[in-house]
UniProtKB/Swiss-Prot annotation:
Protein name, per record: DNA polymerase IV 1
Annotated HAMAP family: DNApol_IV (MF_01113)
Cofactor annotation: Mg(2+)
UmuC domain sequence ranges: 46-226
Naturally occurring in which organism (per UniProt): Mesorhizobium japonicum (strain LMG 29417 / CECT 9101 / MAFF 303099)
InterPro entries recorded: DNA/RNA_pol_sf (IPR043502), DNA_pol_Y-fam_lit_finger_sf (IPR036775), DNA_pol_Y-fam_little_finger (IPR017961), DNA_polymerase-Y (IPR050116), DNApol_IV (IPR022880), IMS_HHH_1 (IPR053848), Rev_trsase/Diguanyl_cyclase (IPR043128), UmuC (IPR001126)
Positions in coiled-coil regions: none
Cofactor info, note text: Binds 2 magnesium ions per subunit.
Family affiliation: Belongs to the DNA polymerase type-Y family.
Catalytic activity: DNA(n) + a 2'-deoxyribonucleoside 5'-triphosphate = DNA(n+1) + diphosphate
EC class of the enzyme, as a word: transferase
Pfam families xrefs: IMS (PF00817), IMS_C (PF11799), IMS_HHH_1 (PF21999)
Gene designation per UniProt: dinB1
GO CC annotation terms, alphabetical: cytosol
C-alpha cells in the first residue's frame, strides 16, 4: 500500500485499503464508495467489533438458499427471537420479541432453532483472528469484543484504523460472515460507533466531537439506563444526554446515587476503563420455554435435569466452575422469579447443579403454572478447585464418578448416546435454550 498522505480527511478505502490523496466520493483506485475519513482517524486506537446478525449470518453462510430470505433464529410459537437477519429486521422483527409477534410481522420468515455449538465454534474462530492483531482483546460475548491497538502500529506498519478495516475484510473472506467496527478513544463511544451503519459498518467518534455528538442523543444510550431508570429520568424531565451535560456531578449523585456519577461522566464522553483481556463471563446458564405451562414439580424436575446437564457441559468445555446456583422461573403472566443458593465450593457437575436447583424449585411449586424454567451458575472461577472428593457423602462421590463415565461416552458417541432417567423421553413439550444475540 502506498505511504499514507498526512491528511486524515482524505482517509482510505475500506475495500482496497488504498490511502486517498483527495476528497473524492469514490476510491481513486477501485471506485468503491466505502471510504473511511475523519480528522482523528489515524490517532484513535480503541475499537469495538461486533459480528452482524451473528447467528443468522452463520446459517445463511451454511445454506446459500437462505441468502435473500427473511430468517429468524428461535423456536416454537411460545418462544422468543434469538436474532433475525436484516431482511427480517426491516419487516419489524427484533431480538427478544415473542415468536408469535415476529411471525405476525413477517409471516414468510424461515425459522431455524439455534445451534449454539456451531455459533460458539465460529465465535472462537473470529476471536482467534482478533488475537493476532493485539494482545488486548476483551470479549463481551461470543460475537463481540473490545480491542486496544495502542502500541501496535510498528508491529503492523499501519495505523489501527487500517488494521481494523483489513480485519473486517479478512473475516468476510476467511469465515464468511461480516462485522461492524467502531473506533474511538474510549469503550463507551467505540461501542456506540459500532452500532452505526450496520451491517459492514465502520464508524469513528473522535474526542473533539464527543460532547456535541452525545448532546442530542437519548439518555437510554448510556449504559445502565434501562426502561425503569429511564422512566425515573423522564419523570425528572431528563430525556437527552445534553440535559445531563448541564447538570453538576453533586446534583446527579444526590438524586441517583452511584448511577449519578456514571451519568455525569459518560454524558461528557469520559470513560477511563481499560480493555481487560482477562475479563471473564459472569455466569453460565440455560433456559427453556414450554409449549404448555407447567405446574407439576415432577415435570419441572425432569426439565431441570436436562438444563443442568447443558450448563455442566458448557462449564467443562470452558474449564470453569461456579459457586452459586441460580434458578429462574417465569410465570404464565410473565412475572419473573430468580432464586439462588451458594455452594460450599465451586462445581461444574450436573448433579450438584441439579440437586441445588431442585431444592430451590420445591419452594416455588405451589400450584403456580410456569412458562419458562432456567438454571445457571455464577461466581465463576477456574475448575482446578472444583468438586473436591466428599469423603463423608459416599453417594455424592459415586454420582460424580458416574457422571464422569457418562461424559466419556457422550464425548465418543454424542450427547444423545446416554440419557438419565430424568431426561429420557423429554423434549416433546419444551424448546431448547434460546440465548439472545444482537
Amino acid at each position: 500500500m502506498a505511504a499514507p498522505v498526512n491528511n486524515p480527511d482524505h482517509g482510505f478505502c475500506r475495500d482496497c485499503l488504498t490511502f486517498q490523496r483527495s476528497e473524492t466520493r469514490r476510491c481513486e483506485r477501485c471506485g468503491s464508495p466505502r471510504l473511511a475519513r475523519h480528522p482523528e482517524l489515524y490517532r484513535l486506537h480503541l475499537a469495538h467489533i461486533d459480528c452482524d446478525a451473528f447467528y443468522a449470518a452463520i446459517e445463511k453462510r451454511d445454506n446459500p438458499a437462505l441468502k435473500d430470505k427473511p430468517l429468524i433464529i428461535g423456536g416454537g410459537k411460545r418462544g422468543v427471537v434469538s436474532t433475525a437477519c436484516y431482511i427480517a429486521r426491516i419487516r419489524g422483527v427484533r431480538s427478544a420479541m415473542p415468536m408469535f409477534k415476529a411471525l405476525e410481522a413477517c409471516p414468510e420468515a424461515v425459522v431455524i432453532p439455534p445451534n449454539m455449538e456451531k455459533y460458539v465454534r465460529v465465535g472462537r474462530e473470529v476471536r482467534a483472528m482478533m488475537q493476532t492483531l493485539t494482545p488486548l482483546v476483551e470479549p463481551l460475548s461470543i460475537d463481540e469484543a473490545f480491542l486496544d491497538f495502542a502500541g501496535t502500529e510498528r508491529l503492523h506498519g499501519q495505523p489501527p484504523a487500517v488494521v481494523l478495516a483489513r480485519f473486517a475484510l479478512a473475516v468476510e473472506k476467511e469465515i464468511g460472515i461480516t462485522v461492524s467496527a467502531g473506533l474511538s478513544y474510549c469503550k463507551f463511544l467505540a461501542k456506540i460507533a459500532s452500532d452505526f451503519r450496520k451491517p459492514r459498518g465502520f464508524s469513528v467518534i473522535g474526542e473533539a466531537e464527543a460532547v456535541g455528538f452525545l448532546a442530542t442523543k437519548p439518555v437510554t444510550m448510556i449504559w445502565g439506563v434501562g426502561k425503569a431508570f429511564n422512566a425515573t429520568l423522564e419523570r425528572d424531565g431528563i430525556r437527552t444526554i445534553g440535559q445531563l451535560q448541564t447538570m453538576e456531578r453533586g446534583d446527579l449523585m444526590r438524586r441517583y446515587g452511584v448511577m449519578g456519577d456514571r451519568l455525569y461522566r459518560l454524558s461528557r464522553g469520559e470513560d477511563v476503563r481499560r480493555v481487560d483481556p482477562d475479563q471473564d463471563a459472569k455466569s453460565v446458564s440455560a433456559e427453556t420455554t414450554f409449549d404448555t405451562d407447567i405446574a407439576s414439580l415432577d415435570e419441572l424436575v425432569s426439565v431441570l435435569r436436562g438444563l443442568s446437564e447443558k450448563v455442566s457441559a458448557r462449564l467443562k468445555k470452558s474449564g470453569i466452575a461456579g459457586r452459586t446456583v441460580v434458578l429462574k422461573l417465569k410465570t404464565q403472566d410473565f412475572k419473573l422469579r430468580t432464586r439462588n443458593r451458594q455452594l460450599g465450593d465451586p462445581t461444574r457437575l450436573a448433579d450438584r447443579i441439579f440437586q441445588a436447583g431442585v431444592e430451590l424449585l420445591r419452594k416455588e411449586t405451589d400450584g403456580t403454572k410456569f412458562r419458562l424454567l432456567g438454571i445457571g451458575v455464577s461466581d465463576l472461577s477456574d475448575d482446578d478447585k472444583a468438586d473436591p472428593p466428599d469423603l463423608v457423602d459416599v453417594q455424592s462421590r459415586k454420582r460424580a464418578m458416574a457422571e464422569g463415565a457418562i461424559d466419556a461416552l457422550r464425548d465418543k458417541f454424542g450427547r444423545k448416546a446416554v440419557e438419565t432417567g430424568y431426561t429420557f423421553g423429554r423434549g416433546r413439550d419444551a424448546h431448547p435454550p434460546e440465548p439472545l444475540e444482537d
